[in-house]
Amino acid sequence: MRRYLITSALVVGLASLLVIASMMTLADAQNQPKAKEFRIERSMPKEAVACIECHKMEHPGIFGDWANSRHASANVTCYDCHKAESFDPDVSKEHYKQYERRDLKYGTKEYKVPVAAVVTPKDCSRCHPDEAKQYARSKHANTHKIIWQIDPWLKLGMNSDLERATGCFHCHGTVLKKTKDGSLDPMTWPNVGVGRINLDGSLGSCTSCHTRHRFSVMEARKPEACGQCHLGPDHPQIEIFMESKHGDIYTAFGDEYNWNAAPGTWSAGVDFRGPTCAVCHMSGAGTVLTSHDVTERLAWESQAPLSVRPENFKPFPAKVNHETERGKMKEVCKQCHGKVWVDDHFVKYDKVNEAYNDIYFKPAKKMLDDLYAKGLLDKSKFFDEELEVEFYELWHHEGRRARFGAAMMAPDYTWWHGFYECKKRFVSFTEGGNDLIKHNKKAYKAIDFPAATGNTTRPAQVFGTGK
């Protein structure tokens, strides 16, 4: 009898242990995240569920991207960003047709809601108001307005509308338009240019840097995000960065950076060893706050024909003082460098801008103006005379490379791609100009200048109808 009781007790005890163990295993399993799982049962309106289920089948790439985003983790759905009012100018009429489909469970009128295909900074501002305000006042958001004021390709119609749509406007942004049937004009869409003029009146595109539908802070912090537009012979910032010591450190140690640190906390020496574009121009550092206004922290407009202080840049004058902004940039630099190092770097950079202005640009501009005044060059159209091209590339290509290279400490770009080429271009330009003056002869004009058919009317959405 005693042996039976002992055996029974052991069986009961073992069973209890198994039950407890199984419960612990179940609890542990419940606490383990499942790979790429997204649970739509979490308090979502039926319209949002319809979006997710439909796009999961129709566009699995979009769904997968979103499902792995912070938006999804925070229960921010397609509907939250794309929802619109029926009277909004950017409502997608095409999307209404999806609610007339019989092959989809959610393709019925029960789930019909107005949505906008284009998500704009105005939409993003519902959750990111500060970022939207900062971005709206930046050069990025206003770049379409800037280029229409200074760019001869647009002002004089020297390239075609197709060349603009597939080239210039992809980065600078286009003016979104609709066709007669209410769909987006294919000459203006798709477009994620930083200065895009949206149908709801807002400026820009957040997806220029935070691409849809992941909207990753990691992606925006990496220099490659900036390099999609800031590259090439006229603004090679990505190439310049990669040549610099900062780029060297990024190449060697970038895979060790904590790219997903919370905004405002991304810190030198903690999350990264060397800065990227975002660190210097946008991220918080020391007492300097994070900003989506890339106009800040600049003491020169060195992409302009003549280097000027940002507050004196006529197409888009900064509302802040360059000395204040230089102080912010120095504060960023001092997270990794001593005061003498930082101060001496900017002394040289200031001198580079002054030297470019006085030695190269001003004398060349004076000769160009003299040639126009004497009637030896025709200013009605730019680029159709060789000396106009020479002058343009002196500042727009070589001059920029010299200034940008000095700003980011890339000596090969400052000298061989910059000032060395400036010298060659300057000599070629001035010799050509002096020859015209000496012989009092007009320059040869390219009669068959190709594709000079672009619309020269400045967009009313930017400048108004009275200008």
Predicted feature residues:
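N-terminal secretory signal peptides that target proteins for export/translocation
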Residues: 1-7
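Short sequence/structural segments immediately N-terminal
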Residues: 5, 21-467
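Bacterial N-terminal signal peptides
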Residues: 9-22
